[in-house]
């Protein structure tokens, strides 16, 4: 078995830099890590939600939670609140909380809920997190240690700021080498194993292990290894998204402690609350609705909370 001495990561953003940090923490500088990314490919930053498992990942790479919250415009996410997915009525809501109900693994809680006559929404009966989250309370207090909690949570983060923080952390803590450049091709040995990536301008980056974080471009897994894209269109028909940043009306407006997910005629709208703004987007099927109509749907949604003038801007 070959010894890994140099890992090359192709692609940056949250995926690339989180990979770099995770490998850096595992390697303890036993091997070198280089990340190459194109300076002309921006990180998409409309607001991003994570699962609670992100806490363990950030702990593993030694990143301060308080620094994350301060630097990434972050808020704490306690689940996802779904609006209008069944009947579309005003009271048609369902919360997927991140704290598991007590005894969920040993008892059928739905049966107890049914016996009680279905008087209250299921999420209100099985976990206290529903009340905490929907009244905009936090799952922990300000003096709770990093990553400890009373109720489980993930994060809402600004993806651009999150990638920048991970980059700084990977370079300073783990010595990751950062290269800006466009990958023009790859080289491989007789067995087909990658040996280097070639950059525009003639430079190359040699390595023993390569990680493809180039997203849909699939510069290694697609262009070199010819692994085809596997569509899930038959079960996930939505294929486009229009996105926007939405300001708060007032600096002290409440920040939603859950991702909001609102059903629409041809898809759904996400609404993620950061400290300084919201990130919203309409995921839809472009075969069923035009981009202009999808954009108008998103604008109408924004108008409900910030008014027509702000939404129009």
List where the protein language model places each region.
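Dinucleotide-binding Rossmann-like beta1-alpha1 core, especially the glycine-rich loop
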Residues: 46-134
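Helix-loop-beta segment of a Rossmann-like dinucleotide-binding subdomain
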Residues: 131-161, 196, 204-205, 274-285
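A conserved short coil-to-beta-strand element within the FAD-binding core of flavoproteins
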Residues: 179-195
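Conserved FAD/dinucleotide-binding core of flavoprotein oxidoreductases
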Residues: 263-313
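Flavin (primarily FAD) binding-site architecture
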Residues: 212-227
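N-terminal Rossmann-like FAD-binding beta1-loop-alpha1 element of flavoenzymes
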Residues: 5-31
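Helical element adjacent to the flavin cofactor pocket in flavoenzyme catalytic cores
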Residues: 149, 153-184, 200-201, 207
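Glycine-rich FAD pyrophosphate-binding loop
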Residues: 24-46
